[in-house]
């Protein structure tokens, strides 16, 4: 009989108690024999008919979710014991695919034959079969657990009176034959971009059929590219009636009732410092040097108290959670919160009283965090500045200094603290990247008119440092109270990534210190060492590729990139849901310290689910914006076909190499088939192509002259050729 303390407690509470999924899985994994339902009933002391029915329902749900398998002899077993895995299908335009699982680090290979049984995006149950001749572990489709039910965007076509749609996403490498349409087919001309809903259980074994549910347009432009991205990545972009109704009850101005239990900081000259085109201001800062013989600085970081307006489980909260993050496209913002909240009520606009959550910090003369405290307050921003304005004032711009002469003393205080943080910055202990970013100048149609380099000045870095300090203080606070919260985790690179990165460095005459497990400081030292090399950006890019992606999770695993033992996101609750969650937890803990009623406390299960979802929405936003930017780049490069440009090899693959064009910071492909002077093979360790006869090489960092051959807008591809072979 399997009984734990949880079961004893739950049996007292519920008459028809049944075991948790975790208990069932533990028993199935540890028991060597196949287990029938009768045996499970005996193991868990289940006697009543109600309990047996409830257990049967739970087992069926676990089977449906791929957690267990029901065998022919009417017994249950875990997938692991049968070398069976659950995963998501990732299609490829050439017909084959991969299975992405949580069990394996590398994706499992799905052959063209196996891909006929499923489509991109399906969640399937698969059997792991032996490695193929290329050494890849492959999978055999057993069952589709959750078919991909997303809407697919594609181009409408007609051939021999047959109507079909060719998906924009090449991972769906099939035609969708149109059965019917919610919109009259007569109104849809050939070449129009439409949205299709697939018929249930669609596979390539038979014709894939679907229904047109929306017409997006025909003439490609930035706005249509955004529409496609929103639907391709299933991003919510409309507000429900419930949200609109809730917004009606939120007042734009705060009153004395809202000030209750808040510290009045309206007299302090807080500033917001952001980009020129920023519309939502969720953070403001103020600092001053300590007096009365004390050494160091006081820094106030005021963050908009979004959690005051967005209560848990309301329509606004559910909509914000679903979106997870704001998405910034060139001509459109898809905000996490409606504009009444994001750019009005919660935005720290100049000369407007706003509710805030404060992180007040005491810093040493070296900018180190000594003590901190969080509290609710009301502030009034004394000015909205841009990074460039602050930087110019710090450097003595006469016109701006005169314009802001009343605030000049406080701006110079920021400058003094900035110099300290720049010298002793906490982020310098971690891996500090100096990326060259492209700045796209758009015309009236939101198409690229020109491209320049976006230079980050000291004002950018100062605000970033202040936000990092506030995030560190917030992480320490929640960690101290051991409350379930979302940490921002960045795991150290895995062993294979370190080995591969070191192989590249070796070819370049460089090395990474730190032995088998290098620390962040070892990477930081490497970046300092190569900072003057012409191939600095290229090496930095390879380093970035070797790193893992940061994620949100209640398990505090630290932030490798910043070299921190714990880290949370606290400073952007208007545009990031994890920050809103952190605010709620902090406010709950502040009330707890005062023995007041609790605000809102999450349990571990809730936080885990929210973390997984927010990590996904962050990746989704990145992919959607990348899609639109790639389209804009291709649209711009169409005008450059035939031009000869200089660039640097930014990546080398088995099918060619990518060249980053110096003038535009855009990558294009020189396909291996265009290298006709020799037969080239790929050196995966040295990341280079080598000529078999000539021994000519094309390596990362090589400078070349290339000609723009063609641009494929649909596939977002720019093809180049060598202008002059070596």
Swiss-Prot record:
> Which molecular-function annotation in GO is an example for this chain?
RNA binding
Protein's UniProt keywords contain S-adenosyl-L-methionine: no
Give the record's GO biological process terms.
Answer: mRNA catabolic process
For this protein, the record's SUPFAM superfamilies field holds: Nucleic acid-binding proteins
**Compartments where located:** Cytoplasm
Which domain of life does the UniProt lineage start with? Answer: Bacteria
| Predominant location category | cytoplasm
Reaction equations catalysed: Exonucleolytic cleavage in the 3'- to 5'-direction to yield nucleoside 5'-phosphates
GO cellular component, as recorded = cytosol
Domain RNB, by residue range, is 262-590
Q: For the S1 motif domain, which residue ranges apply?
A: 642-723
Q: What is its EC number?
A: 3.1.13.1
Main function: 3'-5' exoribonuclease that releases 5'-nucleoside monophosphates and is involved in maturation of structured RNAs.
State whether it acts alone or in a complex, and with which partners, per the record. Answer: Monomer.
Its family remark reads: Belongs to the RNR ribonuclease family. RNase R subfamily.
Name used for this protein in its record? Ribonuclease R
Per the record, the gene is rnr
């Amino acid at each position: 009989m399997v009984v734990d303390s949880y079961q004893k407690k739950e049996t007292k509470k519920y008459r028809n108690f049944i075991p948790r999924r975790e208990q069932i899985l533990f028993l199935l994994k540890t028991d060597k024999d196949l287990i029938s339902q009768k045996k499970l009933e005996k193991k868990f002391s289940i006697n009543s008919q109600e309990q047996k029915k409830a257990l049967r329902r739970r087992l069926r749900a676990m089977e449906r979710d791929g957690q267990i398998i029901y065998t022919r002899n009417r017994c249950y077993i875990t997938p692991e014991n049968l070398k069976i895995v659950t995963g998501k299908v990732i299609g490829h335009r050439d017909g084959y695919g991969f299975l992405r699982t949580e069990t394996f680090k590398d994706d499992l290979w799905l052959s063209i034959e196996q891909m006929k049984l499923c489509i991109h995006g399906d969640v399937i149950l698969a059997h792991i079969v032996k490695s193929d001749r290329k050494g890849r572990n492959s999978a055999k489709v057993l069952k589709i657990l959750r078919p991909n039910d997303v809407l697919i965007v594609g181009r409408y076509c007609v051939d021999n009176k047959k109507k079909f749609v060719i998906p924009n996403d090449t991972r769906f490498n099939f035609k969708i034959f149109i059965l019917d349409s919610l919109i009259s087919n007569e109104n849809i001309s050939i070449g129009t971009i439409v949205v299709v809903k697939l018929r249930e259980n669609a596979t390539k074994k038979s014709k894939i059929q679907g229904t047109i549910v929306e017409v997006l347009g025909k003439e490609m432009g930035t706005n249509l590219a955004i529409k496609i991205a929103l639907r391709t990545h299933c991003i919510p972009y409309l507000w429900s009636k419930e949200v609109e109704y809730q917004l009606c009850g939120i007042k734009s101005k705060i009153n004395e009732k809202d000030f209750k239990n808040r510290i009045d900081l309206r007299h302090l000259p807080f500033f917001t410092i952001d980009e020129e085109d920023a519309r939502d201001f969720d953070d403001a800062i103020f600092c001053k040097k300590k007096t009365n013989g004390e050494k160091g600085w006081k820094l106030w970081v005021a963050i908009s108290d979004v959690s005051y307006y967005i209560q848990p489980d309301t329509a606004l909260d559910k909509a914000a959670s679903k979106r997870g993050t704001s998405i910034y496209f060139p001509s459109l913002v898809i905000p996490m919160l409606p504009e009444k909240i994001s750019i009005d009520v919660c935005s720290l606009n100049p000369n407007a009283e706003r509710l805030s959550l404060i992180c007040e910090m005491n810093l040493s003369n070296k900018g180190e965090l000594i003590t901190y405290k969080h509290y609710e307050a009301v502030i009034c921003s004394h000015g909205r500045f841009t990074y460039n304005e602050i930087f110019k004032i710090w450097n003595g711009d006469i016109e701006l200094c005169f314009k802001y002469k009343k605030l000049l003393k406080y701006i110079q205080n920021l400058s003094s603290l900035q110099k300290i943080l720049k010298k002793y910055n906490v982020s310098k202990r971690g891996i500090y990247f100096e990326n060259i970013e492209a700045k796209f100048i758009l015309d009236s149609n939101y198409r690229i008119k020109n491209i320049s380099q976006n230079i980050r000045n000291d004002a950018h870095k100062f605000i970033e440092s202040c936000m990092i300090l506030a995030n560190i203080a917030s992480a320490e606070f929640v960690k101290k109270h051991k409350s379930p919260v979302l940490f921002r985790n960045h795991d150290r690179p895995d062993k294979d990534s370190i080995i591969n990165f070191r192989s590249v460095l070796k070819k370049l005459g460089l090395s990474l210190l730190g032995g088998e497990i290098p620390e962040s400081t070892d990477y930081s030292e490497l970046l300092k060492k190569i900072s003057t090399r012409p191939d600095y950006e290229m090496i930095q890019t390879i380093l970035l590729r070797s790193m893992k992606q940061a994620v949100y999770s209640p398990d505090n695993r630290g932030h490798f990139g910043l070299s921190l033992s714990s880290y949370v996101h606290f400073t952007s609750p208007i545009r990031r849901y994890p920050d809103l969650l952190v605010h709620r937890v902090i406010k709950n803990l502040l009330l707890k310290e005062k023995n007041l009623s609790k605000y809102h406390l999450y349990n571990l299960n809730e936080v885990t689910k929210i973390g997984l979802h927010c990590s996904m929405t962050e990746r989704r936003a990145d992919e959607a914006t990348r899609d639109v930017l790639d389209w804009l780049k291709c649209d711009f490069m169409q005008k450059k076909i035939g031009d000869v440009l200089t660039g640097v090899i930014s990546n080398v693959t088995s099918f060619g190499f990518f060249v980053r064009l110096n003038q535009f910071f855009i990558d294009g492909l020189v396909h291996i088939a265009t290298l006709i002077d020799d037969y080239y093979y790929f050196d995966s360790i040295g990341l280079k192509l080598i000529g078999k006869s000539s021994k000519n090489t094309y390596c990362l960092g090589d400078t070349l002259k290339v000609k723009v051959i063609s641009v494929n807008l649909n596939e977002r591809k720019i093809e180049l050729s060598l202008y002059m072979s070596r």
